[in-house]
């Protein structure tokens, strides 16, 4: 059980600051807990894919934490995990249908990794460790902070891989945000041949390793 699950039922500024800092940096689900690595490594070959999956996971975390916290006193302890999974699966289905309806190209690009959010340890972990033990407002904000932390990690890794692999940034972002976003695409440099390693799975592992190393260096300097 992490220290967030023991927060008092208060709403002081320090509580919100702690929740936010834990979710985004200190206890980042991707860079500290190393959870949800399968979708992180698989779809982070571009900012568009990374942002799409990050927003979907953020939405699922907020909704599942909200429902679990609302009904935490009514859910029988013995069958709480199957109930949490059902709640998460329902939320993921809603996200999947919305993406299929409004961002179909991105939906096709992300493929199986949208329904796989159901099995993401981040989501079920926050429901069990935090939402089931804390009031609604704290649970919702915890879902937001944890989801934001994962989303930022995804986008940062996706940006690195897209820049190195294709020389672009925000390529295909119109599939997520609409036609108006076509102007956001940036071609940083022209590549006669793509640096395939960056956009293939080995590049994802190398990129994640570099990000983890940078974070550890920053944390060590802050402690000094």
UniProtKB/Swiss-Prot annotation:
Its EC number is 7.-.-.-. GO terms for biological process: electron transport chain. It is found in: Cell inner membrane. InterPro entries: NqrDE/RnfAE (IPR003667), RnfE (IPR010968). The chain crosses the membrane at residues 51-71, 81-101, 105-125, 140-160, 194-214. One of its GO terms (cellular component) is plasma membrane. It is a multi-pass membrane protein. Its main location: membrane. Keywords: Cell inner membrane, Cell membrane, Electron transport, Membrane, Translocase, Transmembrane, Transmembrane helix, Transport. The keyword Protein transport does not apply. The keyword Nucleotide-binding does not apply. Pfam families: Rnf-Nqr. The complex is composed of six subunits: RnfA, RnfB, RnfC, RnfD, RnfE and RnfG. Belongs to the NqrDE/RnfAE family. Part of a membrane-bound complex that couples electron transfer with translocation of ions across the membrane. PANTHER family: ELECTRON TRANSPORT COMPLEX PROTEIN RNFE (PTHR30586), ION-TRANSLOCATING OXIDOREDUCTASE COMPLEX SUBUNIT E (PTHR30586:SF0). This is Ion-translocating oxidoreductase complex subunit E. It comes from Pasteurella multocida (strain Pm70). The lineage of its organism: Bacteria, Pseudomonadati, Pseudomonadota, Gammaproteobacteria, Pasteurellales.
